[in-house]
């Protein structure tokens, strides 16, 4: 259902508030440069620092500005099952095409707890749902066997797999790739994951290089493996630079250097350190981004 280059959109702030005008411009910039879908209010969108009204407003603005041109997969995950259901219901009412549901963080549920959490959301809200497995941020890895159980539910249509493990991604696709889509959650292994059967990527890099990420995915679907491989290798340095410090600090800094938004972050995220900034600038200059 969801395929191609889907941007994990940063949330622009100015003077402590969501910068709505810039957010609208960023949506247009993505679509004009070939992005196939937009996912606001995820990790890269600093969703954990948004209050409920801000969270819903960001989703609403993105849906309005997209205006049906590409799918919108709204981040509505929470470590509270009840809250995730509420956010997902509201996103559906606003017109989201799907929701992105991160595994519950901090409370470290068992595999059975993960299953019951996602099953409860799927039972409560009739909207296409993308599971989001990112154990480096949540503290728990959702195993392929658990995903396979969840894949039996009609509302669960995909998983954003961000373990960085090709072995786990391959096991996912072997176990349930015929029932749900597997989407790369790591820019640096998009091409290898697609070679194993992934349908695309939910990308951090696409915030600053949307055309190139979209072209990589398009080349793969066109059967031009040489071009897809070339783009994969050419993007490795910028992909790595996006994670020299905690995401989304590097990508928001990069976007600010390109004039796409202000550099403003919300605590507890802090500005990029001086050494990391120098590294980021050098990498961006090598790509002609600044």
Swiss-Prot record:
GO BP of this protein: diaminopimelate biosynthetic process; lysine biosynthetic process via diaminopimelate
GO (cellular component) term, any one: cytosol
Main location: cytoplasm
Part of a proton relay during catalysis (site feature) positions: 43, 106
Pathway(s) per entry: Amino-acid biosynthesis; L-lysine biosynthesis via DAP pathway; (S)-tetrahydrodipicolinate from L-aspartate: step 3/4
Entry's localization field: Cytoplasm
SUPFAM superfamilies linked to this entry: Aldolase
Top-rank taxon, per record: Bacteria
Residues annotated to bind pyruvate: 44, 202
Pfam families, A to Z: DHDPS
Coiled coil start-end: none
CDD domains reported in the protein's UniProt record: DHDPS
Gene3D superfamilies from the UniProt entry: Aldolase class I
One Gene Ontology MF term: 4-hydroxy-tetrahydrodipicolinate synthase activity
UniProt keyword Cytoplasm, yes or no: yes
Enzyme Commission designation: 4.3.3.7
Stored PANTHER family: 4-HYDROXY-2-OXOGLUTARATE ALDOLASE, MITOCHONDRIAL (PTHR12128:SF66), DIHYDRODIPICOLINATE SYNTHASE (PTHR12128)
Quaternary structure and interacting proteins, as annotated: Homotetramer; dimer of dimers.
Protein name: 4-hydroxy-tetrahydrodipicolinate synthase
Higher taxonomy: Bacteria, Pseudomonadati, Thermodesulfobacteriota, Desulfuromonadia, Desulfuromonadales
Gene: dapA
